[in-house]
Amino acid sequence: YKRQIMGSTTDEPHAKKITDKLDEYNITWEQHAASAHKQPLKVLEILENNKNNNDIIYITIAGRSNALSGFVAANSQFPTIGCPPFSDKADMLVNIHSTLQMPSSTPVLTVIDPGNCALAVKRIFGV
């Protein structure tokens, strides 16, 4: 069972690439839109509501200054996969580091390709 958190509803097209693959793999998912910068309490509420569940992987989707991935990883005991959307290669080169560089005790796995992100979830769950 997987939770997907987008920083904004504008990330929906990128999220759909992931959820379409998860559907192919028959992996149940739930989607939320909440910005770590603008709605940190909403993100914490999502994490709190799921803390007693099992078999959760968070996929975080946030571009530009991606605080969401680190915020989720730092405040949850479940794995976090950051799959940031990029408009083009220049955008990726400028913004990828906000997903890659995390403080200690904040493990974020980064997968740039949405299909590979879903495949990583499938393999982690062993399905």
Where are these regions (language model features)?
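Glycine-rich phosphate-binding loop
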Residues: 45-84
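Conserved small/polar residues in nucleotide/adenosyl-binding loops
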Residues: 1
